[in-house]
Amino acid sequence: MSERQAEACAAAGADAIGMISFPRSPRHIDHRRMRLITSNLPANVCPVGVFVNENFEKIMATVETGRLRAVQLHGQESPDLVEALSAEGLIVIKALFVDGRPALDQAARYPASGFLVECAGGPLPGGNALQWTWSDARRISSDRPVVLAGGLSPENVGEAIEAGIPDAVDVSSGVETAPGQKDIDKVTAFCRAVAANDQITPRRIFR
């Protein structure tokens, strides 16, 4: 994702911009480019770094260089790491899955700001366009902030919101022409579809 694409996503109505710090991913963005992206975002858009099994020091170095306000942890990170990052004033979102299946029963272990729930059945963390039963998210969304992901697109995000009642939704491949290349028309359509269902989302994470 380029600086221009990030700015266009923000203008389309995105509440947050996710940037993946994971070299194996085709969407990987190094911390220097993160800073270029975050420097041009409006104050009401939250820059989020996505990490996979990274240690506290590496995450914080990227947070500081990239000027991130939130982190999304997509691996087997410990509750202690979540607590340490939260103590730094960060919004911490923990992805919940075990062996490619949503692991909603693990939420109570983590002092996180919110939880990303998806099927996680692909070869890389996130962005695999795999759908699952979105209504399963209701098992925790009633009392814990939830970010819903997994096979979302402009055509189905309204249905997903109605099914899972999340605080936010996370999309990647559903609005891309290629990994990391956003289709701004699709982003705009996606944001409009989310806004049309805004009245049923608790919004406990980014607003």
Where are these regions (language model features)?
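Conserved N-terminal beta1-alpha1 strand-loop-helix module at the mouth
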Residues: M1-R207
